[in-house]
Amino acid sequence: MEKKKILIIPLCAVLIALVAAVSVMLKRNSISKHSLIYADVNDNKLISYKISEKAEIRISFDGYSEYLLVGKYIGGEYCCVSKGENSLYDVLLIKNGNIEKTYQLSFCPDEIAATDDGIYCLTNGKIYRLSTADNTETLYKDNVYTHKYRLNMLITDKGDLVYLREENDGSVSLVLDCDGQETDVFTFNPDDTIDVGLNTDNRFLYKDKSGNYKTMAVSVYGGKQQKYGKSATFVQASSDGKLAVKCKRQVLGECSDVYIVDGKTGIAVSTHLVDLDIPYSVVVV
């Protein structure tokens, strides 16, 4: 009887390890089915980088040749800003690989994000809201902090706006805007804090200089600050809220590879892209 117990214990350990390995493999395969969408800043082309194939594919839509910027689109796959044949700036909402709707802007923003109700455009410290009902532009926020930050305006998977507000005393507040109702998430000294984006689970990630640049996380919908536990150069949640993009510096060659990461399990798949190859405005689909 004792011999049987001795044999069963190692067998159970092997089975547990096998199940864990299979689970990780399945998650990696699931992550690999996704693609990165971004605009090539060198020739203004729209690029889809397929993780499974480690290859770039150019995307084009009839009537458009220059693609300047991409952003998150709640309700579809992504949005992008393009210069049309009439030399105006068009916002294309992409769903299922096709243009769902088109809107016109009088300027090219620095950052863009879209919902079914409105399109948010950040430029020169101001956020403009483009109505999806009548295509009108209105000034929405005029005190946005942008200095030394890569991501200053974000959209949660619920379609709510998150942005950085500059305060009179020089501090900066992370603000959640739900249909015009603002809630201050937390306030920080911009000289000591570097933001890295909005992760899955609607957690805002940032690096604190006073804490040896450890990555911290705080939920924009309430909750205490906590250590994120993993290094990140920037983070952008995917349109389905399941995956995130992050950069991770490798020891060999001092090269920053871009990883697709499951935000809930930490499983990562390398894209073999370096972070300098893609801009901060990248969307996972």
List the model feature ranges, each with a label.
Residues 93-96, 100, 114-118, 129-131, ...:
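Flexible "stalk/tail and boundary" regions
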Residues 1-15:
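N-terminal Sec-pathway targeting helices
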Residues 55-61, 98-104, 136-143, 181-188, ...:
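A short beta-strand motif characteristic of beta-propeller blades
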Residues 206-261, 266, 272-273, 277:
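Intrinsically disordered, low-complexity segments enriched in Gly and acidic/Ser/Thr residues
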